[in-house]
UniProtKB/Swiss-Prot annotation:
Binding locations of substrate: L134, V135, S136, G137, G138, D167, G180, N272
Stated role: Required for the formation of a threonylcarbamoyl group on adenosine at position 37 (t(6)A37) in tRNAs that read codons beginning with adenine. Is involved in the transfer of the threonylcarbamoyl moiety of threonylcarbamoyl-AMP (TC-AMP) to the N6 group of A37, together with TsaE and TsaB. TsaD likely plays a direct catalytic role in this reaction.
Cofactor requirements of the protein: Fe(2+)
Subcellular location: Cytoplasm
Origin species: Aeromonas salmonicida (strain A449)
Catalytic reactions of this protein: L-threonylcarbamoyladenylate + adenosine(37) in tRNA = N(6)-L-threonylcarbamoyladenosine(37) in tRNA + AMP + H(+)
UniProt name for this protein: tRNA N6-adenosine threonylcarbamoyltransferase
Name of encoding gene: tsaD
């Protein structure tokens, strides 16, 4: 069985084909980074228009890469939310239209479920149950996962997501868009301990997170200490240390509360090397295991959507004729399969 996956929830157009016996047969990805760079962030209208231009050519390229035509596809999965509603509608409309034209089932996929399941594409895949840390530009949450669709929200960011805080702080430091990865690179040149940022919400019980205050703290630190290259690197290091420490503390608590020994980390920020190293140390100390998707599946992509869609299609879960697009969609409202 093969599923075509379509991802257009923000500023990446991702198309992939997943085979339940052979794995990923094709993977096409187009990033809009250059399009949005001059604006310092994603412009929703421009994102939607670019998805219109790129989605169908990438579908054609994915089919060609896999050596398939429409008869070789058993279902079409598309991101139905959460995300930018205009961008979502592009992929959802194309996916639903192709499903109708090709007489195939269409599967509406939750974007964050796609991220959560991305490590399942690896040879070393996690077994249920596990705790998932989902960290991206739009979301930061801890979830207990007992099976596909069986999700319990343990905690989430009450303001900025971790990735959003990275990008906003990078912008304050004059780094180009998208600034998060550039800030991390700058932090590698920094000295630990010169500056100390708070670890938000770690001095109280609970698993919710907050990162917006770190951006303000960074702005004040920059204003008070100048912006020579080494100072900027030291501030970047202090900021990254604060975010990573906070996430690690919350993961430790979540694992303790649930009694689980497996941790899945997914989403764009999961590619951060400092975060990976610290969580590896954490899980070693707990005699547990940590799982990640490969780097190319950390950011938005069609492979995770194709995989998630396959699991729901196998369970007989697919959409009626209507196009589904949900800009706000709590992960823990999904039905288990």
């Amino acid at each position: 069985m093969r599923v075509l996956g379509i991802e257009t929830s923000c500023d990446e157009t991702g198309i992939a084909i997943f085979d339940d016996q052979k794995g990923i047969l094709s993977h096409q990805l187009y990033s809009q980074v250059k399009l949005h760079a001059d604006y310092g962030g994603v412009v929703p209208e421009l994102a939607s228009r670019d998805h219109v231009r790129k989605t169908i050519p990438l579908i054609q390229a994915a089919l060609q890469e896999a050596g398939l035509d429409k008869d070789g596809i058993d279902g079409i999965a598309y991101t139905a939310g959460p995300g930018l509603v205009g961008a979502i509608l592009v992929g959802a409309t194309i996916g639903r239209s192709l499903a109708m034209a090709w007489n195939k089932p269409a599967i509406a996929v939750h974007h964050m479920e796609g991220h959560l399941l991305a490590p399942m594409l690896e040879e070393r895949a996690p077994e249920f149950p596990f705790v998932a840390l989902l960290v991206s530009g739009g979301h930061s949450m801890l979830v207990r996962v007992d099976g596909i669709g069986s999700y319990q929200l343990l905690g989430e960011s009450i303001d900025d997501a971790a990735g959003e805080a990275f990008d906003k702080t990078a912008k304050l430091m004059g780094l180009d868009y998208p600034g998060g990865p550039l800030l991390s690179r700058l932090a590698e040149k920094g000295t630990t301990g010169r500056f100390h940022f708070p670890r938000p919400m770690t001095d109280r019980p609970g698993l919710d997170m907050s990162f917006s205050g770190l951006k303000t703290f960074a702005a004040n630190t920059i204003a008070a200490n100048g912006d020579d290259e080494q100072t900027r690197a030291d501030i970047a290091r202090a900021f990254e240390d604060a975010v990573v420490d906070t996430l690690a503390i919350k993961c430790r608590r979540a694992l303790k509360e649930t009694g689980l020994k497996r941790l899945v980390v997914a989403g764009g920020v999961s590619a951060n090397r400092h975060l990976r190293a610290q969580l590896a140390e954490l899980m070693e100390s707990l005699k547990g295991k940590v799982f990640y998707p490969r780097t190319e599946y950390c950011t938005d992509n069609g492979a995770m959507i194709a995989y998630a869609g396959m699991q729901r299609l196998k369970a007989g879960v697919f959409e009626p004729l209507a196009v589904k697009a949900v800009p706000r969609w709590p992960l823990d409202t999904l039905d288990p399969v």
